[in-house]
Amino acid sequence: MYCGSCIRDNSLAAGLGRLGWDVTLLPLYTPIRVDEEDNSVDQVFFGGLNVYLQQKIPLFRHLPAFVDRWLDNPKLIRRVASKAVNVSASELGDMTLSMVRGEHGHQAKEVKRLVHWLKEIGKPDLICLTNLLVGGSIPALKRE
């Protein structure tokens, strides 16, 4: 299955790159899945597996960074996503609200990681969030 958001974001990044812009595409939840050249960095922010576990099991909200890196590994996420994993939409409501709460939600350390990466590594002039589920990060992004 290919996500329309992945295709749109990857095409936008490629098009802006052809126009001479320096563009960094950060995958959210899962690695970018497209048929054409993948224009994203080889990291996943708010990794779907990690975010889900942080929501369901409080211990995962306090694990060290090396465990988070393992859970957010694109190869691991691809492997898990390739299995027939069904999550009921009715089970995702609390996680959706938590994500929108940003720094005050169960995924607060994911917000901190994204903000740190953008501030210290990415250093963008412009940030375009094409998925408003991470909109809870906006106050932290504006502050930093």
Language-model-derived ranges and their functions:
Residues 5-16:
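Short amphipathic alpha-helix
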Residues 1, 32-36, 135-138:
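Short catalytic/ligand-binding loop motif for oxyanion handling, primarily in non-cytosolic enzymes
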Residues 126-128, 141-144:
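Active-site proximal beta-strand in glycosyltransferases
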Residues 130-134:
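Short His-centered aromatic/hydrophobic patch
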Residues 19-24:
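A generic structural motif
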Residues 118-124:
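Glycine-rich phosphate-binding loop signature in dinucleotide/nucleotide-binding domains
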Residues 25-113, 121:
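A conserved catalytic-core segment of Leloir-type glycosyltransferases
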